[in-house]
């Protein structure tokens, strides 16, 4: 995930959660 959770949360909410955790 490149660009931050705000950029990809729409496409990868589950991955964003793991990366942001």
UniProtKB/Swiss-Prot annotation:
Its EC number is 3.4.21.-. The keyword RNA-binding does not apply. Residues 1-21 form the Peptidase S1 domain. The keyword ATP-binding does not apply. It is found in: Secreted. GO terms for cellular component: extracellular region. It is an enzyme of class 3 (hydrolase). Expressed by the venom gland. Belongs to the peptidase S1 family. Snake venom subfamily. Multifunctional venom serine protease that has fibrino(geno)lytic activity towards the A alpha-chain of human fibrinogen (FGA) and a slow activity towards the B beta-chain (FGB). Also hydrolyzes bovine low-molecular-mass kininogen and releases bradykinin. This is Snake venom serine protease jerdonase.
């Amino acid at each position: 995930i490149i660009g931050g959770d705000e950029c990809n949360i729409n496409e990868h909410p589950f991955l964003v959660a793991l990366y942001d955790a």
